[in-house]
Regions:
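Amphipathic alpha-helical segments in well-structured domains
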Residues: 8, 12, 106-111, 144, ...
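Short, solvent-exposed loop/helix junctions and linker helices
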Residues: 6-9, 58, 62, 103, ...
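Catalytic helix-loop patch of NAD(P)-dependent Rossmann-fold dehydrogenases
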Residues: 2-17, 21-27, 36-97, 104-105
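Short, well-ordered alpha-helices that flank and scaffold nucleotide-derived cofactor binding pockets
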Residues: 17-21, 70, 74, 115, ...
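C-terminal substrate-binding subdomain of Rossmann-fold SDR/epimerase-dehydratase oxidoreductases
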Residues: 97, 117-259
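Residue(s) in the substrate-gating loop at a strand-loop-helix junction
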Residues: 33
Length: 259
């Protein structure tokens, strides 16, 4: 937990202090996570003005990072002082559970699935009914870049927190995601290894993206099945193809969904 706080809280503060120390940064988009919210297991999505919190060290450290961002924004990058005391536009962004090719992190559902499938092993699922807002990594990235471009053009208008989550129908249980991975991969078997003694993990977490939709004109392009299909396609091809070209191809595929 100490390293988690050092990374997520002090790491965030160090970046903001670096921004303060230079005149070359004009826009800062600070990325946290949907887990920054105080999770009450509610059946509707969290809005940007709801309380920060967190049961576990990871979630609470992300909530603390958001509080630090808000503090630095008020104290050092206040919109009212723009052009007088500073020239920085600072916002924070929160996405859902991102998936996509190239993710090999530990204890994440897609990498765990792919590692098991490539090894010819069954996929163990420890929390099958946990519901998450799943989205391909290109979805929030498109939102972050759109926000940054608007902040560049209007530096005092968008200095707030923003949610960039998926469509409502993409908020599904872990088991459904793993099942779809197997379908797209063409083989595999799931094992439910959930036990009552596992570490605490929220069962329900959703984001409300109304603010980004109406104020930025941003909304997700893909549904959950398209997200998983694009992700699995990357993992099936990366060993035999040029990864850079594959990524560019997938960006083009993603952009085509919005036409």
């Amino acid at each position: 937990p100490v390293e988690t706080y050092a990374t997520n809280v002090m790491g965030t503060i160090n970046i903001m202090e670096a921004i303060r120390a230079t005149n070359n940064v004009k826009v800062g988009v600070m990325i946290t996570t949907d887990k920054c919210y105080e999770n009450k297991e509610q059946i509707w999505g969290y809005r940007e003005n709801e309380p920060m919190g967190g049961y576990d060290p990871y979630s609470s450290s992300k909530g603390a990072a958001e509080i630090a961002i808000a503090s630095w924004r008020c104290s050092f990058f206040n919109s009212a002082d723009y052009g007088k005391k500073h020239h920085v536009s600072l916002a924070s962004v929160r996405a859902g559970n991102v998936i996509g090719g190239g993710d090999w992190a530990l204890d994440r559902i897609i990498p765990d699935c792919i590692k098991a499938l490539e090894a010819g092993k069954d996929i163990d699922i420890r929390n099958p009914q946990a519901i998450r807002p799943w989205q391909h990594v290109l979805e929030p990235l498109s939102g972050y870049m759109l926000l940054a471009s608007k902040m560049w053009k209007e530096p005092t208008k968008y200095c707030e927190g923003w949610n960039f989550g998926p469509r409502a129908e993409s908020i599904v249980p872990v088991w459904d995601v793993a099942t779809d991975v197997i379908k797209n991969y063409g083989s595999g078997q799931l094992n439910d290894i959930s036990t009552p003694n596992t570490l605490h993990e929220a069962k329900l977490l959703m984001l409300d993206i109304s603010k980004a939709k109406f104020l930025l004109g941003w909304e997700p392009r893909m549904n959950i099945h398209q997200c998983i299909a694009l992700t699995v396609d990357w993992y099936k091809r990366y060993k035999d193809e040029d990864v850079y070209a594959l990524c560019l191809e997938q960006i083009e595929t993603y952009l085509a969904y919005g036409k």
